[in-house]
């Protein structure tokens, strides 16, 4: 992962990169980093080079030069590129270049739901106006299939989350729906609002049984049969993922880099999380749902000051989403026109039963509003 630049032309309400500066990676630094990472990788290994900002396409010339360098120097290796963009700069020359490289360069779009939701979350830095109308959504859907839409839900747009998912999917995009992590979810009405939205999504996916679930609800429930491991992690931060800042310093991911942590990032230079275990005194360590929980070390650090301790409100949100996913998956299994369920279906139903019993405990009475069956 290369943090090509830190500057951005938007001022998103929830952005976790709160220490943005004008730092831009030089091509020489990029070459040095890439050479160190790629030199000893065998030709059969698939490698992904992720280019991120800020808004990455503010450094479009650098991106082109990086891709050109890697394609020439490492042409025998299986290397692909990925990038997430706010889309406002993807026009003209940028579109032509991306079209020409579409088989190896894959781009995700930050799109926060309906036009209103997106504009509420993602205004331009200079004008304060919404950025939705500056995005050529059709270009993305015509260039890649599928296209991931990173739909971030903020406290202000939570009450419209279901409509946002429906809109994104109606535009031919895959909804990678997540909750904003650069802020704390302390509004007392958030839980009740989320329950209402999950009910709507349950009904939506019941009416469209062939649709793939949005990321928020696309949960492998069978994973709860895996014994919780203290070294479990939802992503590869500090293990299979290395993030390099403009100076070429290595961090576990962008959430631990200077653009996010400022001076505190010095504590995580070269940090290796491969041997990290959750402390015994954290609720997550023995949680039955650890293997299906989308926890994030960087988000934990931002919210609680401890990479191993999740914000309590996120625990509640994640359990609600697991319950909603269980409801949808239960209905889909039971709708199958067969007299005998497969072994996989039986395992899923058993997982659902456990989720129901565990979440509907005296400690979670507020979840009774979302019946499983």
Model-derived features with residue positions:
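C-terminal accessory region of radical SAM enzymes
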Residues: 196-226, 249-295, 299
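Canonical Radical SAM [4Fe-4S] cluster-binding loop centered on the CxxxCxxC motif
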Residues: 1-28
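Flexible glycine/acidic-rich beta-alpha junction loops that bind and position SAM and/or redox cofactors
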Residues: 116, 120-121, 175-194, 213-229, ...
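Short, acidic, Ser/Thr-enriched surface-loop or helix-capping motifs
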Residues: 245
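Radical SAM enzyme core and accessory elements
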Residues: 285-373
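Short metal-coordination and nucleic-acid-contact micro-motifs, chiefly zinc-binding Cys/His arrays
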Residues: 4, 8, 280-283, 289, ...
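Radical SAM/AdoMet-radical enzyme domain recognition
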Residues: 34-50, 59-182, 186
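Short, small/polar residue-rich loop motifs at catalytic or cofactor-binding pockets
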Residues: 235-239
């Amino acid at each position: 992962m290369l943090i090509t630049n830190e500057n951005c032309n938007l001022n998103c309400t929830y952005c976790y990169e709160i220490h943005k500066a004008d730092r831009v990676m030089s091509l020489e630094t990029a070459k040095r980093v890439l050479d160190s990472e790629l030199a000893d990788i065998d030709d059969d290994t698939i490698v992904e080079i992720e280019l991120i900002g800020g808004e990455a396409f503010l450094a479009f010339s650098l991106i082109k030069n990086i891709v050109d360098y890697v394609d020439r120097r490492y042409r025998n290796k299986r290397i692909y590129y990925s990038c997430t963009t706010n889309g406002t700069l993807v026009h003209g020359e940028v579109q032509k270049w991306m079209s020409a490289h579409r088989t190896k360069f894959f781009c995700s779009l930050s799109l926060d739901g309906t036009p209103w939701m997106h504009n509420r979350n993602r205004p331009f830095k200079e004008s304060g106006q919404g950025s939705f109308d500056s995005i050529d959504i059709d270009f993305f859907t015509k260039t890649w299939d599928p296209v991931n839409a990173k739909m971030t839900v903020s406290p202000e747009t939570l009450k419209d989350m279901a409509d946002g998912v429906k809109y994104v999917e109606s535009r031919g995009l895959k909804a990678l729906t997540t909750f904003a992590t650069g802020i704390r979810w302390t509004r007392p009405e958030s839980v009740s609002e989320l329950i209402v939205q999950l009910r709507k999504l349950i009904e939506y996916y019941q009416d469209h049984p062939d649709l793939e679930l949005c990321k928020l609800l696309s949960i492998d429930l069978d994973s709860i049969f895996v014994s919780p491991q203290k070294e479990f992690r939802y992503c590869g931060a500090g293990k299979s993922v290395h993030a390099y800042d403009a100076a070429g310093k290595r961090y576990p991911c962008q959430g631990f880099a200077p653009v996010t942590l400022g001076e505190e990032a010095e504590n995580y230079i070269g940090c290796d999380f491969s041997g990290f275990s959750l402390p015994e005194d954290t609720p997550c360590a023995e949680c039955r749902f650890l293997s299906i929980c989308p926890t994030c070390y960087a988000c934990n650090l931002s919210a609680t000051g401890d990479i191993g301790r999740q914000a309590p409100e996120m625990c509640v949100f994640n359990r609600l989403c697991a319950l909603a996913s269980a409801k949808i998956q239960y209905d889909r299994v039971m709708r199958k026109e067969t007299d005998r369920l497969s072994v996989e279906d039986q395992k899923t139903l058993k997982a659902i039963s456990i989720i129901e019993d565990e979440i509907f405990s005296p400690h979670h009475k507020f979840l009774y509003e979302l019946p499983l069956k």
